[in-house]
Regions:
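A short alpha-helix-loop-beta-strand transition element characteristic
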Residues: 70-91, 148-157, 297-305, 367
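Conserved flavin/dinucleotide-binding core of flavoenzymes
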Residues: 2-3, 8, 17-20, 28, ...
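Dinucleotide-binding Rossmann-like beta1-alpha1 core, especially the glycine-rich loop
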Residues: 54-121, 128-129
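Glycine-rich FAD pyrophosphate-binding loop
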Residues: 26-51
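Central helical "cap/lid" subdomain
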Residues: 226-233, 239-301, 365
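Active-site/ligand-binding neighborhood in enzyme catalytic cores
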Residues: 125-227, 235-238, 248, 255, ...
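Hydrophobic anchor at the start of a short beta-strand
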Residues: 9, 30-32, 252, 289
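Glycine-rich Rossmann-fold phosphate-binding loop(s) that bind the pyrophosphate
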Residues: 13-15
Length: 445
């Protein structure tokens, strides 16, 4: 055991990145401590239960078959999964026209986007052949240059920039958009359900995996409710000042989102490129709401519960009903400007606005849920946004090379630093394992 307060490695953050890093460090025989600001583990994953046992995932919740890192954890811990309900027709509100599939105009644009994304090297997006051009150009400008219809432009803004990046097309570059798509293998692997990113859910909620990961570490490894305020560091180690005391380590893995990592005080200050990466990677803006009903009435109407819309505040809905659940759940998402609009309303008005659109999509029964549950990740002190952070235009080519690079004794892990499935659980696990490997190599060298 290490002497009090000194470890081979301290991990800041107990989300999937931090817990994955801790497991690799412990497996390598390194003394390890995990410091978590929240009173729980899981980071941007949070599962709650209603009084009757209905499961609600308030944060991240889905896994897909090509997400091999998180799938390995599901198998390791014997966590049960179930397919996302998907029988029935999808609704696409396309400029006021009610469709049951993706319009051909959009399918063609998706193919063009996929072809461009294949030109982006996911480990080094700044080295793409047209990186400088694509990083200067916003996705909104690219859409405008396509000469597509107004409704198609609106669809791409809401479904790609909103549904994938939790922002607006005017806020993100073409390069950031293409990198994110390339990291998952294409547009459809990101947007789809069966066989894609939204394929599977976890019995007991996504937080159950994080809980089991934490419990599987040596007793006392994870220290909750103790945010790191300051890190004094040099090439040989670091002193971490927390709300409750201090710790020393030969190496530190900062496994929190860029926005939060940038709020820690560093002495000496971080290099300009590293600090610049923090400042140019704001968190996304999304609002996720759950409407709980006595039964999944939409299924009787031949609907899957999946909807995408170019109008109203809601961009997407999904049937989020767990198996054997006493009640049914429709979950809806607002992104970017629409999410900000909703946040400005009081809870009663938000409820009215959301239910009105659900009623337009699914009929009058959607207007009267038993319960209406929302969770605002922007208001969470130790999150400050969702789904994940993304570079603003110019960020990748100016600061991308610094995103994962260690700074002396400091290493970086979070889904935003992942090469594959960036923004997802899987990317978080990848990043934690990569940072732990860096620490292991540094301490054995």
């Amino acid at each position: 055991m290490p002497r009090f307060g000194y470890y081979d490695a301290v991990v800041v953050g107990a989300g999937f990145a931090g817990l994955s890093a801790a497991h690799e460090l412990v497996r390598a025989g390194l003394s390890t401590r995990v410091l978590e600001a929240r009173p729980r583990v899981g980071g941007r994953v949070l599962t709650r239960y209603l009084a009757d046992g209905t499961q609600l995932d308030l944060g991240g919740q889905w896994i897909g078959p090509t997400q091999l890192n998180i799938t390995e954890l599901v198998q390791r811990y014997g966590v049960e999964t179930y397919p996302t309900p998907g029988e029935g027709a999808m609704i696409v509100d396309y400029g006021g026209h009610r469709l049951t599939g993706t319009p051909p105009e959009i399918t063609e644009l998706f193919a063009e986007i996929d072809a461009m994304a294949r030109q982006v090297p996911v480990a080094e997006p700044w080295n793409a052949p047209r990186a400088a051009e694509w990083d200067r150009c916003t996705f909104a400008s690219w859409i405008a240059d396509r000469g597509c219809s107004q409704v198609a432009a609106r669809f791409l803004d809401r479904v790609i920039s909103g549904g994938l990046l939790a922002g607006s097309a005017s806020e993100t570059s073409v390069l950031e958009t293409l990198f994110y798509i390339a990291s998952a293998g294409g547009v459809e692997p990101l947007l789809g359900y069966a066989g894609a990113a939204q394929d599977t859910r976890i019995v007991g909620g996504a937080q159950e995996i994080a809980n089991r990961m934490a419990a599987d570490l040596p007793a006392g490894t994870v220290h909750l409710s103790d945010p790191v305020l300051r890190i004094e560091h040099d090439g040989s180690g670091a002193r971490l000042v927390t709300r409750l005391g201090e710790q020393w380590a030969s190496r530190v893995i900062i496994a929190v989102p860029p926005m939060l990592a940038g709020r820690i005080q560093y002495d000496p200050p971080l290099p300009g490129l590293r600090e610049g990466a923090f400042q140019r990677m704001p968190a996304g803006t999304a609002m996720k709401v759950h409407a709980v009903y006595p039964e999944p009435f939409w299924r009787a109407d031949g609907l899957s519960g999946v909807a995408r819309s170019t109008s109203g505040v809601l961009t997407e809905t999904v049937d989020n009903t767990p198996p054997n659940s006493p009640r049914a759940v429709l979950t809806a998402f607002a992104y970017g400007e629409e999410a900000i609009l909703l946040r400005r309303r009081d809870p009663a008005e938000r409820r009215r606005i959301v239910l009105a659109q659900l009623g337009e999509l699914f009929g009058g029964r959607a207007l009267e849920p038993d319960e209406f549950v929302e969770f605002d990740w922007l208001a969470e002190e130790w999150t400050r946004g969702c789904f994940s952070g993304h570079f603003i235009p110019g960020g990748w080519t100016s600061f991308g090379a610094a995103l994962r690079a260690p700074v002396g004794a400091l290493h970086w892990a979070c889904t935003e630093t992942a090469v594959r499935w960036n923004g997802y659980f899987d990317g978080a696990v990848e990043s934690g394992r990569r940072a732990a490997a860096e620490v292991g190599a540094a301490l054995s060298g």
